[in-house]
């Protein structure tokens, strides 16, 4: 059943494990893994912190939307999106309509533990990162849930075990819906 899956898109807050789980899931599915943040960096030749510094968050979000539009049209990939990708209605539509969306739901304590020393996250370079993470979680959680086909809690199991659970959920999801492979493009 897994061979028939369309692309799989991972959403969730920073520190949820989208990149780690995405890589492992792609390997299990025999698919290409793409991280939308890395894609934006490769397209601009600059890191996200620089883009935020020079263009602000709005400039980065415009680039991110273009990237998500392009990436969600690629057949049978596993895509890890940036934590804020769901803020744009356009991105939510691309994700929901073009593949299976998995929300990796990490509590704020897990996010703090995983991002505490990461200086590459511009939104956390503030005096109170916990407050920032809590605010982001409160604002974004309903949007992650709105776009998700599958919700997977993170932070309490090993990544490989989580990927095995996701494969089971993907099989169940496909069996219970009319999900088929993406049509060939003309």
Curated annotation (Swiss-Prot):
InterPro entries: P-loop_NTPase, Shikimate/glucono_kinase, Shikimate_kinase/TSH1, Shikimate_kinase_CS. GO terms for molecular function: ATP binding; magnesium ion binding; shikimate kinase activity. Its main location: cytoplasm. It is found in: Cytoplasm. GO terms for biological process: amino acid biosynthetic process; aromatic amino acid family biosynthetic process; chorismate biosynthetic process. ATP binds at residues 15-20, 121. GO terms for cellular component: cytosol. Substrate binds at residues 37, 61, 83, 140. Binds 1 Mg(2+) ion per subunit. Mg(2+) binds at residue 19. Pfam families: SKI. It comes from the Bacteria. It catalyses: shikimate + ATP = 3-phosphoshikimate + ADP + H(+). Keywords: Amino-acid biosynthesis, Aromatic amino acid biosynthesis, ATP-binding, Cytoplasm, Kinase, Magnesium, Metal-binding, Nucleotide-binding, Transferase. Signal peptide: none annotated. Its EC number is 2.7.1.71. Pathway: Metabolic intermediate biosynthesis; chorismate biosynthesis; chorismate from D-erythrose 4-phosphate and phosphoenolpyruvate: step 5/7. Its cofactor is Mg(2+). Catalyzes the specific phosphorylation of the 3-hydroxyl group of shikimic acid using ATP as a cosubstrate. Belongs to the shikimate kinase family. HAMAP family: Shikimate_kinase (MF_00109). Monomer. This is Shikimate kinase. The gene is aroK.
């Amino acid at each position: 059943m897994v061979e028939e899956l369309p692309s799989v898109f991972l959403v969730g807050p920073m520190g949820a494990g989208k990149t780690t789980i995405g890589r492992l899931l792609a390997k299990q599915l025999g698919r290409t893994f793409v991280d939308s943040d890395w894609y934006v960096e490769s397209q601009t030749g600059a890191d996200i912190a620089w883009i935020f510094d020079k263009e602000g968050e709005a400039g980065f979000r415009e680039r991110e939307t273009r990237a998500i539009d392009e990436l969600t049209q690629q057949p049978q990939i596993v895509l890890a999106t940036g934590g804020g990708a769901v803020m744009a209605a356009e991105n939510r539509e691309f994700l929901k309509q073009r593949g299976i969306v998995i929300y990796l739901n990490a509590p704020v304590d897990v996010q703090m533990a995983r991002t505490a020393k990461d200086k590459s996250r511009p939104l956390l370079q503030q005096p109170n990162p916990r407050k920032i993470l809590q605010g982001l979680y409160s604002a974004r959680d309903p949007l992650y849930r709105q776009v998700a086909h599958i919700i997977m809690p993170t932070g309490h199991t090993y990544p490989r075990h989580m990927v095995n659970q996701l494969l089971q959920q993907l099989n169940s999801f496909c069996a219970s819906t009319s999900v088929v492979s993406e049509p060939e493009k003309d």
